[in-house]
Amino acid sequence: MEVTADQPRWVSHHHPAVLNGQHPDTHHPGLSHSYMDAAQYPLPEEVDVLFNIDGQGNHVPPYYGNSVRATVQRYPPTHHGSQVCRPPLLHGSLPWLDGGKALGSHHTASPWNLSPFSKTSIHHGSPGPLSVYPPASSSSLSGGHASPHLFTFPPTPPKDVSPDPSLSTPGSAGSARQDEKECLKYQVPLPDSMKLESSHSRGSMTALGGASSSTHHPITTYPPYVPEYSSGLFPPSSLLGGSPTGFGCKSRPKARSSTGRECVNCGATSTPLWRRDGTGHYLCNACGLYHKMNGQNRPLIKPKRRLSAARRAGTSCANCQTTTTTLWRRNANGDPVCNACGLYYKLHNINRPLTMKKEGIQTRNRKMSSKSKKCKKVHDSLEDFPKNSSFNPAALSRHMSSLSHISPFSHSSHMLTTPTPMHPPSSLSFGPHHPSSMVTAMG
């Protein structure tokens, strides 16, 4: 068979599955693209010849005795998934991966791709499988290989999402593991609403992961790692007053609670006003006033109830033996005395003499003070004012009766010549001043 120099260029790039006549889907279940038809596959005898040709078309001795055994020894099974790089940064929600462009940038620096003009021998000992098919889209890769690492790590900030070509090399497997550990540093607690939204987007992307998609999205989107803006841009409500109404007036402090207070004198627990003694102890209003007026503690013995008028009917004065008085009093011994004897004893500290006793009760006419007299005069003048003025009902009725005979449409001179007395008498009105007096005052 005649061999040309152009054949090694495309033969060296094909997968062994192609050379053996097998469909590529049997080795790559995740990859669904194929650029070769079954009719174009070369025959096994042609493959045996082509494997013993170098890049310049010269025949070289075979390394293996059989081409089929050489194929088996040179190409390990494709189910070794540990050699396939699975970068953790391929997130399903990032639409900037465009079909073959995203993986194409990764494989540019990869030793898996062989140049058509390369001088490297075809019998290299690379453990990884050779890339013969064009790279699949990001969705098919995520559904086939990268599904374990696609959603197990939290999304990273946008600055770390840019594709790194070094992650796709076989020697950077350790660095990929280290990057996966560093991804845990960017774990941000998400609100409940954003968690639900993220889970919904993950479910939708997982459903679309099995099918190939090459839709191009020129506008990049950020992963849902950003928390709510209200929690970061605005201070908490506790710094502004504790509530949205914190900008208003502050609530007034509550009044002092009187629970637990007790008067140290009488033991009262309820009083309209709490007072304090000289030592700072609480006193009820009654004990506090008594201590303030008398300088001593209020006596705890309740005074005897005053007898009603029926019970005092037979009461007599212990000094003068009278039974009629305007006010009953008590002496130092507690005996009831009349008003006259009680006042006399209060003023002179001696009992009232019996010679001063009178049959009738003497009353006095209290003199009115000058202030009360002045108020009484003003009150009387105000009472007399409506009687003399023309605003009283009698004057108004007379005036209306005098106007009743005038027609409402007649213009009589009587209305103009006869003025209505609408002013008070001359005693309360001011008389007109003569112009001459004004000139005299000005001159």
From Swiss-Prot:
Residues 1-29, 128-180, 194-216, 361-389, 414-443 are annotated as: Disordered. One of its GO terms (cellular component) is nucleoplasm. GO terms for molecular function: cis-regulatory region sequence-specific DNA binding; DNA binding; DNA-binding transcription activator activity, RNA polymerase II-specific; DNA-binding transcription factor activity; DNA-binding transcription factor activity, RNA polymerase II-specific; DNA-binding transcription repressor activity, RNA polymerase II-specific; E-box binding; histone methyltransferase binding. Residues 1-258 are annotated as: Interaction with TBX21. Keywords: Activator, Deafness, Disease variant, DNA-binding, Immunity, Innate immunity, Metal-binding, Nucleus, Phosphoprotein, Repeat, Transcription, Transcription regulation, Zinc, Zinc-finger. A motif (YxKxHxxxRP) lies at residues 344-353. Residues 135-150, 414-429 have a biased composition (Low complexity). Residues 288-316 are annotated as: Flexible linker. Gene3D superfamilies: Erythroid Transcription Factor GATA-1, subunit A. Residues 364-377 have a biased composition (Basic residues). A zinc finger (GATA-type) spans 263-287, 317-341. Pfam families: GATA (PF00320). The modification Phosphoserine is found at residues 115, 162. Interacts with TBX21 ('Tyr-530' phosphorylated form). Binds DNA via the 2 GATA-type zinc fingers. Each zinc finger may bind either adjacent sites in a palindromic motif, or a different DNA molecule allowing looping and long-range gene regulation. The YxKxHxxxRP motif is critical for DNA-binding and function. It is linked to Hypoparathyroidism, sensorineural deafness, and renal disease: A disease characterized by steroid-resistant nephrosis with progressive renal failure, hypoparathyroidism, sensorineural deafness, and renal dysplasia. Transcriptional activator which binds to the enhancer of the T-cell receptor alpha and delta genes. Binds to the consensus sequence 5'-AGATAG-3'. Required for the T-helper 2 (Th2) differentiation process following immune and inflammatory responses. Positively regulates ASB2 expression. Coordinates macrophage transcriptional activation and UCP2-dependent metabolic reprogramming in response to IL33. Upon tissue injury, acts downstream of IL33 signaling to drive differentiation of inflammation-resolving alternatively activated macrophages. This is Trans-acting T-cell-specific transcription factor GATA-3. It comes from Homo sapiens (Human). The lineage of its organism: Eukaryota, Metazoa, Chordata, Craniata, Vertebrata.
